Amino acid sequence: MKKILLTNDDGYHAKGIKALEQALEEMAEIYVVAPKHEKSACSQCITITAPLRAEKIKGKEGRHYRIDDGTPSDCVYLAINELFKHVCFDLVISGINLGSNMGEDTIYSGTVAGAIEGTIQGVPSIAISQILSNKNKNTPLSFDLAQKIIQDLVQNIFTKGYPLKGRKLLNVNVPNCSLQEYQGERITPKGYRLYKKEVHKRTDPKNESYFWLGLHPLEWQKRENEDRLSDFDAIASNHVSITPLNLDLTSYDDLKSLESWHEGMLK
């Protein structure tokens, strides 16, 4: 039977990872290693300055752990190299994240980082996120569409094989809409996220300042002369966005121009 490792950045008890497990439990043998506490926007952080403690969850056949103060990258690293080192995983899936991970957010994202760590460890990996809107943050959220998408995607991978070669992963974003409103899937490039420079300054009872970094509205810049919808555009039209991501961040188009610019200094 196929074996899938799940993680997230919302924490072991988050609704998204439970929905993910429910969606896949009849398709594969599921293992879960997730942070004990929320680690949103922790990026590819891995813990090397403090010990990590792994708590085995009772009643889960020894396949569930939560990592005290661990990040998604910690969780995947520990799962593959120690906790389940005798298990050959077919997939690592990180999610279902509560909120989008598109454009430059993929660099900040702990969810995407979990899938990146799986890729680094040589396992085909997927990050999946459920878009939220301001109006529904405090209302019940349905994962029906996200569950359907991940089931279809995993089944396709099990049938056809993983579609990417080398150090690459899939980043999936699911729109905040019903199955009836859903318009299909699009293979997309990353868009350009627009950020506001918000910092919220507050004063505590001791009259000392503290700060909250601003939560930015989901705004983006339209790509010019682009035949494909970006991930943002796809979501805005109730499409699921599937984006291939490459761990190699080298800007190959600029290598020659940089050599020319640096001419005379290179030895």
From Swiss-Prot:
GO cellular component: cytoplasm
Catalytic activity from the UniProt record: a ribonucleoside 5'-phosphate + H2O = a ribonucleoside + phosphate
Subcellular location: Cytoplasm
Enzyme class: hydrolase
Keyword Transit peptide: no
Binding site residues for a divalent metal cation: 9-10, 40, 97
Protein's UniProt keywords contain Nucleotide-binding: yes
UniProt remark on cofactor binding: Binds 1 divalent metal cation per subunit.
Gene Ontology molecular functions: 3'-nucleotidase activity; 5'-nucleotidase activity; exopolyphosphatase activity; metal ion binding; nucleotide binding
Keywords: Cytoplasm, Hydrolase, Metal-binding, Nucleotide-binding
Cofactor requirement: a divalent metal cation
Paired cysteines (S-S): none
PANTHER family, A to Z: 5'-NUCLEOTIDASE SURE, 5'_3'-NUCLEOTIDASE SURE
Family, as annotated: Belongs to the SurE nucleotidase family.
Chain's role: Nucleotidase that shows phosphatase activity on nucleoside 5'-monophosphates.
Protein name, per record: 5'-nucleotidase SurE
Organism: Helicobacter pylori (strain HPAG1)
Gene name in the database record: surE
